């Protein structure tokens, strides 16, 4: 809004910058996928509907410290001290977090704590390097809280199929993009050829979200 652009126009500009980066690196992706792609929206709604039908999603009120730039909530102990004495700073952008409350839909991540530990034990080489694997294990062993997966305060996003007054939170919606890119929800044969024999290269600062 400050730049006189809609969210879609701003996202288009950002996507173009990423595509230019690939060209500079002489990398030609099979597909440059975005969360605004129509087939991704269809896949997200189908995926989350199944998760909802399986009883892993419920409604509750979320309250916490939110960073607009990160589009993420932080626990009190995750924020950095504010030298001005105000609200704590988010650890990435070092901007004051905002206290935020709203009714959201939640995913029962806590129910998957032991299954995740079992998966890591059965797949010791699935996450690397070792330091990052241990970091992920530490997060799980420290206890997993249920996570908010929707937002009612914005309309930029994929609408929730059973409650279109809310949209999916980007950090839940975007991760499904990996599956969409190889055919989930649109091309079953292609999806079966690729998944789960895939390798993800991610930034070390977003390990927690993944």
Where are these regions (language model features)?
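Short acidic, glycine/serine/threonine-rich loops at helix termini
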Residues: 1, 44, 70-72, 77-80, ...
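N-terminal Rossmann-like or analogous alpha/beta NTP/dinucleotide-binding catalytic cores
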Residues: 1-58, 208
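Basic, alpha-helical terminal appendages of large translation-related enzymes
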Residues: 4-9, 60-65, 75, 93
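Short, conserved phosphate-binding/catalytic loop or strand-edge motifs used
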Residues: 28, 64-70
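Structured secondary-structure scaffolds
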Residues: 34, 39-43, 69, 92-209
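Short, flexible, mixed-charge glycine/proline-rich loop motifs
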Residues: 54-63, 76-85
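Cys/His-enriched microdomains
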Residues: 65, 87-89, 146
């Amino acid at each position: 809004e400050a730049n006189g652009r809609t969210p879609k126009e701003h996202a288009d500009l950002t996507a173009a910058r990423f595509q230019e980066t690939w060209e500079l690196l002489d990398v030609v992706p099979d597909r440059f996928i975005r969360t605004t792609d129509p087939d991704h929206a269809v896949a997200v709604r189908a995926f989350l509907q199944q998760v909802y039908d399986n009883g892993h999603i419920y409604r509750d009120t979320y309250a916490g410290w939110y960073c607009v730039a990160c589009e993420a909530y932080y626990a009190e102990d995750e924020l950095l001290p504010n030298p001005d004495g105000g609200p704590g700073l988010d650890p990435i952008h070092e901007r004051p977090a905002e206290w935020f409350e709203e009714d959201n839909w939640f995913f029962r991540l806590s129910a998957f704590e032991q299954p995740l530990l079992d998966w890591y034990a059965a797949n010791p080489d699935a996450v690397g390097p070792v330091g990052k694997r241990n970091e992920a294990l530490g997060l799980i062993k420290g206890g997993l809280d249920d996570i908010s997966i929707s937002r009612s305060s914005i309309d930029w996003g994929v609408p929730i199929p059973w409650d279109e007054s809310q949209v999916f939170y980007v950090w839940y919606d975007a991760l499904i993009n990996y599956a969409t890119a190889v055919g989930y929800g649109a091309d079953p044969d292609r999806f079966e050829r690729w998944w789960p024999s895939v390798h993800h290269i991610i930034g070390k600062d977003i390990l927690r979200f993944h």
